[in-house]
């Protein structure tokens, strides 16, 4: 299973992960590329750093997207750590993650923007 920028916008991400583990054969692979797209609602450092998720949406009313994101669980948890814990709990045997994009605050804190999770059932 391969997903890219999907998991963050699911109302029930744990259920989605459970379905993924259900349909995968033994030794099946999950590749999930995602990010902390709306974590700025939860974390002041992310908020101060700003977010450029909407730069490519010129002329579009993004308030609708923002209102939806405010209701999503994954807007309020730091990832990929959260995902890794869920994947362990539901039965994935091997889990690796890689940070694909990050930035540093003036204080030196690393902010994870995009990541890859590779999990094997």
Task: Give the residues covered by each predicted segment.
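A conserved beta-strand element that flanks and buttresses the S-adenosyl-L-methionine
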Residues: 2
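Short catalytic micro-motifs in class I SAM-dependent methyltransferases
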Residues: 5-6
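C-terminal alpha-helical "lid/dimerization" subdomain adjacent to the S-adenosyl-L-methionine
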Residues: 33-107
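C-terminal lobe and adjacent flexible extensions of AdoMet/dcAdoMet transferase-like proteins
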Residues: 90, 115-121
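A short, glycine/Asx- and small/polar-enriched loop/turn
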Residues: 109-114
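Short conserved AdoMet
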Residues: 11, 25, 121
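Nucleotide-sugar-dependent glycosyltransferases with a strong bias toward membrane-associated enzymes
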Residues: 10-13, 17, 80
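A short glycine-rich, Lys/Arg-flanked "PGG" loop and its adjoining helix->strand segment in the class I
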Residues: 14-29
């Amino acid at each position: 299973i391969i997903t890219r920028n999907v998991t963050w916008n699911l109302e029930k991400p744990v259920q989605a992960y459970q379905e993924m583990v259900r349909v995968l054969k033994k030794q099946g692979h999950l590749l999930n590329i995602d990010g902390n797209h709306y974590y700025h609602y939860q974390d002041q450092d992310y908020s101060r750093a700003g977010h450029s998720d909407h730069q490519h949406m010129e002329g579009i009313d993004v308030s609708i997207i923002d209102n939806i994101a405010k209701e999503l669980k994954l807007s309020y948890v730091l990832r990929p750590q959260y995902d890794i814990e869920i994947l362990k709990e539901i039965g994935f045997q091997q889990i690796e993650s890689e940070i694909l994009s990050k930035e540093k605050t003036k204080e030196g804190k690393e902010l994870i923007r995009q990541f890859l999770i590779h999990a094997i059932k």
